[in-house]
């Protein structure tokens, strides 16, 4: 299983790459220049690949979050008093942290 912080960094990098490629594709260049045409084609292909990867990563995050919600729901139904205790503890910690500000 991959690290959530690493996944986030990868998503940020892919988003930045996507934005950069879109900017390059919008920029002016001599369409008659063969290198420009080749570069534009490669950039469009790379942009499509990046968009697919970002979409897949987004789907993966959604699936993992949904699974975590189901596990938490099952846990609370199996052990309601422990769930209440955890909720109270989290609320207490958040209250203390917010009160310090």
Swiss-Prot record:
One of its GO terms (biological process) is DNA damage response. One of its GO terms (cellular component) is cytosol. It comes from the Bacteria. The chain crosses the membrane at residues 80-99. Keywords: Acetylation, Cell inner membrane, Cell membrane, Membrane, Transmembrane, Transmembrane helix. Its main location: membrane. It is found in: Cell inner membrane. It is a single-pass membrane protein. GO terms for molecular function: ribosome binding. The keyword Plastid does not apply. Induction: Maximally expressed between 6 and 12 hours of growth, in early stationary phase. Pfam families: DUF883 (PF05957), DUF883_C (PF19029). The modification N6-acetyllysine is found at residue 35. Upon overexpression binds to ribosomes. Belongs to the ElaB/YgaM/YqjD family. This is Protein ElaB.
